[in-house]
């Protein structure tokens, strides 16, 4: 009967009957007290259930769950984007695509535009994770000390340009504003990371020594600039161990000694600008084998100038610089308070003259021709390391000091008199690490050295002249028209004027090399490749009691006419000029009173001894090492060796123009 009632009753009645059966079982097992409590709780539960039963027989729990389902479906319906939201999103996408299309078009147009200026980078930058590039995938990555050609400004955050390396195409370069913002964001993240780590951890040893370097090196993807290039790591690695001690000590934080130890870290955070403006074409500067102004050095460099003039005809400007451009340090030119100190010092060149020369070199480089400087006062790479010229330093090297000694002595008594100062200068160059030079020419034969230098410059030419920008440069004809050199000594003398006008003549014409003629033999040089910045300038160096004339002093009494005319007529007789030159120099320097007469005697005896000494020098120099292959920083792959175009002279055998 119970089963019949259950089958006829609704499901809720069956549930109630089942509960009653359970209660009966509990009454049989539970004690009286527990039975009363269970009955009371059952009664209350039954009343609650009856009170929340729905009209359809469902309980309150069912009703609640159903209401949740209905509410969720309503919410999901109302969260769908409206028509206005969809149209707004489409408009944004259309604007983004249009901006990208315009940026791509501007990028294409910039390929044929001339280079506006060039910069050398002081930081590294990776575009791998950049998401705000005007054209995705077109940002340019670079390392510190790379060179960039900038075509134009795209917006406040991006420039258009290219990396000066063969095979690199035009793209977007982050502007200094963008790099500075990235640097600040990165520093802020580093500080926050250090703060949170010091709060959460009890170990204070990582607060300065470990957290800061690691947070810098694990740069978040959104921060692509490499802050390590600013040199902070070097200072942090020097922090003493007691500042990394895990023992928290008040003295270690507040003592003056601790503050002194931390100061270098904060001083280093004086950020270097991300870019330095440099000439569009890096000027080539020759140094070595010894001091300029002496016959051996001048003869070897003159042979290279002649070769370059013929090899790169139409693509090269060779210009003479008489001002002391080593004074053109950025810290001096940008700081007016230092100008008076330089002006009061005993220098040959005024700052105005130096500044004018620097501007002229920049203007020559805008033509994107190769620029070669015959710089009178530059004898060491350190002299130009802090200037804005970023030169290609070519080291003309004689590996054996004995060979250099023989060469100097073979030039006569006037040169042997200054043997010591020349040997000291050569030794200082030999002590420089190879990284200070871009090219080291240490070959025994002139033609090998010339081809080595030509290979490097050909690679540099290709790096600065990509196929996509092969249009003629409108600046070229204008610059060359204002910088041409007179072709004869007569024209040179008419255009130059007196010695007093020499230093104020700012035309400093581009030099034509002399006609290639065979002449006597002097020797050699070996050469390879590298870069610049080391010991102090020594063009005015003195060694013990034997004091040699530096190039700087010698040119004080030499006329511009005698220098320029010698480039055109290398075989003319210089005896009268040199006698006058040394006579006037005795007024300058009383310690060299016998210089003029010894030079005259040297002119008479030099030709008699040259043939014998030449053969001895040649045999000894041939024992030197064979040529090292240059590592070309402008080629991404090994370039082909350019076929040799031999000059008329086959060795370092030219009796070229000698500057004393």
UniProtKB/Swiss-Prot annotation:
Q: Which residues form the SH3 domain?
A: 114-183
**Where in or outside the cell is it found?**
Cell membrane, Sarcolemma
Q: In this UniProt entry, which cysteines form S-S bonds?
A: none
Q: Which Gene3D superfamilies match?
A: P-loop containing nucleotide triphosphate hydrolases, SH3 Domains
Could you tell me one molecular function GO term of this UniProt entry? voltage-gated calcium channel activity involved in regulation of presynaptic cytosolic calcium levels
Q: In which tissues is it expressed?
A: Expressed in all tissues.
Any GO CC annotation of this UniProt entry: voltage-gated calcium channel complex
Q: What is its main location?
A: membrane
Low complexity biased stretches? 55-65, 197-209, 486-495
Q: Where is the composition biased (Basic and acidic residues)?
A: 560-602, 610-623, 632-641
One Pfam family assigned to this protein is VGCC_beta4Aa_N
What topology does the record note for this protein and the membrane?
A: Peripheral membrane protein
Phosphoserine modification, residue list: 204, 207, 218, 550
One GO term (biological process): calcium ion import
Region annotation (Disordered) maps to: 39-101, 190-261, 486-641
Maturation and modification: Regulated through phosphorylation at Thr-554 by CaMK2D.
Residue(s) carrying Phosphothreonine: 554
| Listed Polar residues bias regions | 66-85
Keywords (alphabetical) are: Brugada syndrome, Calcium, Calcium channel, Calcium transport, Cell membrane, Disease variant, Ion channel, Ion transport, Membrane, Phosphoprotein, SH3 domain, Transport, Voltage-gated channel
Q: How does it assemble?
A: Component of a calcium channel complex consisting of a pore-forming alpha subunit (CACNA1S) and the ancillary subunits CACNB1 or CACNB2, CACNG1 and CACNA2D1. The channel complex contains alpha, beta, gamma and delta subunits in a 1:1:1:1 ratio, i.e. it contains either CACNB1 or CACNB2. Interacts with CACNA1C. Interacts with RRAD; interaction may be involved in beta-adrenergic regulation of heart rate and contractile force. Interaction with RRAD regulates the trafficking of CACNA1C to the cell membrane. Interacts with TMIGD2. Interacts with CAMK2D. Interacts with CBARP. Interacts with CAMK2A.
Return the similarity comment.
Belongs to the calcium channel beta subunit family.
| Disease connection | Brugada syndrome 4: A heart disease characterized by the association of Brugada syndrome with shortened QT intervals. Brugada syndrome is a tachyarrhythmia characterized by right bundle branch block and ST segment elevation on an electrocardiogram (ECG). It can cause the ventricles to beat so fast that the blood is prevented from circulating efficiently in the body. When this situation occurs, the individual will faint and may die in a few minutes if the heart is not reset.
Please explain the role this protein plays, according to its UniProt record: Beta subunit of voltage-dependent calcium channels which contributes to the function of the calcium channel by increasing peak calcium current. Plays a role in shifting voltage dependencies of activation and inactivation of the channel. May modulate G protein inhibition. May contribute to beta-adrenergic augmentation of Ca(2+) influx in cardiomyocytes, thereby regulating increases in heart rate and contractile force. Involved in membrane targeting of the alpha-1 subunit CACNA1C.
Identify this protein by name.
Voltage-dependent L-type calcium channel subunit beta-2
What gene name is given for the protein in this entry?
A: CACNB2
